[in-house]
């Protein structure tokens, strides 16, 4: 199986601040092996939230990665944030990301 990663500009900037390049590769490898491991976000149209350990952040310094798995072979990496700054997406954030995915996937 091949899994393609498409990163939003926001995600690319956030993940660079949160993970080392090696830790980011480990995250991608994990998603390659287990693409549906993130918890489904209720009412999001299929968005997933993956809990991941942050680089040098210790046991409690995890991050959250929000992504959308499309057709089982494409992962849209949308946003990432430290757990200690935000635990869940707000309803407005969830709606905005859902609309973004709906727009993108219907144009393809």
Where on the chain are the PLM-derived regions?
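Amphipathic alpha-helical interface surfaces
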Residues: 7, 23, 27, 59-62, ...
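Basic/aromatic recognition patch in beta-strand/loop cores that engages polyanionic ligands
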Residues: 37, 41-81, 85
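Residues that form generic nucleotide/phosphate-binding pockets
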Residues: 14, 30, 100
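Compact soluble domain cores
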Residues: 19-38
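Enriched for short, Lys/Arg-rich terminal
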Residues: 68-108
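Arg/Lys-rich, positively charged N-terminal/basic patches that mediate binding to nucleic acids
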Residues: 1-22
């Amino acid at each position: 199986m091949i899994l393609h990663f498409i990163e939003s500009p926001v995600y690319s900037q956030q993940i660079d601040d949160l993970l080392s390049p090696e830790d980011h590769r480990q995250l991608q490898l994990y998603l390659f092996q287990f693409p549906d491991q993130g918890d489904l976000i209720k009412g999001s149209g299929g968005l997933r939230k993956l809990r991941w350990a942050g680089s040098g952040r210790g046991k409690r310094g995890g991050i959250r990665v929000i992504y959308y798995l499309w057709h089982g072979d494409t992962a849209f990496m949308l946003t990432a944030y430290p757990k200690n700054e935000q635990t869940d997406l707000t309803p407005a954030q969830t709606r905005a990301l859902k609309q973004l995915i709906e727009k993108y996937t219907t144009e393809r």
